[in-house]
Structure formats: C-alpha cells, structure tokens
UniProtKB/Swiss-Prot annotation:
Family of the protein in this entry: Belongs to the MoaB/Mog family.
InterPro entries: MoaB, MoaB/Mog-like_dom_sf, MoaB/Mog_dom, MoCF_biosynth_CS
Listed GO biological process terms: Mo-molybdopterin cofactor biosynthetic process
CDD domains per UniProt: MogA_MoaB (cd00886)
Organism: Staphylococcus aureus (strain Mu50 / ATCC 700699)
Gene3D superfamilies assigned: MoaB/Mog-like domain (3.40.980.10)
Keyword NAD carried by entry: no
Name assigned to this protein: Molybdenum cofactor biosynthesis protein B
Keywords: Molybdenum cofactor biosynthesis
Length: 168
C-alpha cells in the first residue's frame, strides 16, 4: 500500500467541517477551527458555507450531513459528540448514513490516542469513519489534541488516496 500514499489529484479537494456542541460558537470552537486550518494548510478547500456548528441533537447532525452529501464535497469531518455522555449522539447520527465503515480509522485513532495523547481515556472515544457513495465522513472528538492527532497522523496522509479509491 505504500506506493499509494503519494497519490496526486488533478483538482482541489473540497471539505466540510461540522462542529457538534451545545456550548461552542464560532469564537470558542477551537476544534472545528483547528480542522479547518489543518485542511487549508494542505490546500483543501473549506468555504465559510461548509463550516458550521450544530447542537448535540441527532436530527440536527443528520440534517446537516445529509445536506452536505448532496453538495460538491469530497469529505465531511465532524468534531465533538463522540464520547459516551448521554448528549454525545454524533456516532448515532452519522453511522447509519455510512455505506461502508472504515473500521481501521477508529481502531488506529484509539491506539494513537492511547499511545500519544490521553492514555487509557482513549477507550471512551467512538471515533468513526466511512463512505457514503463517493464521499468520506470522519467523526472525531472535538478537543484540539484529538483533532491534530486525527488530521496529522491519519486523515491528511491518506486523504488523496482515499478520494482516488472512491472515485476510480
């Protein structure tokens, strides 16, 4: 698989960032802002229209994700709502939409979180990734540490390859 890591796409990758939180707004949303900055640093387009915040409510999350699935977007990244608290419903909203789950993402994310970031608290994460038709969805925790780990170690290194595989 190593030969696929440097896949170049002949177009700009387009992403959407959805922060799920009952308390964050556009000023205090460090996780969503971090996702956006890390993607844009790699020339991934995240327009203002494709960055928003919704409450920890299953219908709100599902509605926004479904809306973006109908648009010209390659990848949707949700932050927040992936834990085990009663209000954490991102996974329940996103997982039923997936055509295929990318199990390795959640497994590797939890492993790296354990080793490099939060230790045994990694078991609380229910981070998930998958595909819906020819689009990718990643649901990750909202902390900036988790965002950086997911984006820098897993998502960004494989993003072009994943999109290439989905669209060939």
């Amino acid at each position: 698989m190593g030969e696929h890591q440097n896949v170049k796409l002949n177009r700009t990758v387009k992403a959407a960032v959805l922060t799920v939180s009952d308390t964050r707004d556009f000023v205090t949303d460090k996780g969503g802002q971090c996702v956006r900055q890390l993607l844009q640093a790699d020339d991934v387009e995240v327009s203002d229209a494709h960055y928003t915040i919704v409450k920890d409510e299953k219908v709100a999350i599902t509605t926004q994700v479904k809306k973006w699935l109908e648009e010209d977007i390659d990848v949707i990244i949700t932050t927040g709502g992936t834990g085990i608290a009663q209000r954490d419903v991102t996974i329940e909203a996103v997982k039923p939409l997936l055509t295929k789950e990318i199990e390795g993402f959640g497994e590797l994310f939890r492993y790296l979180s354990y080793v490099e970031d939060v230790g045994t608290r990694a078991l609380l994460s229910r981070a998930v990734a998958g595909t819906v038709n020819n689009k990718l969805i990643f649901s990750i925790p909202g902390s900036t540490g988790a965002v950086k780990l997911a984006l820098e170690k897993l998502i960004k290194p494989e993003l072009n390859h994943l999109i290439h595989e989905l669209t060939k």
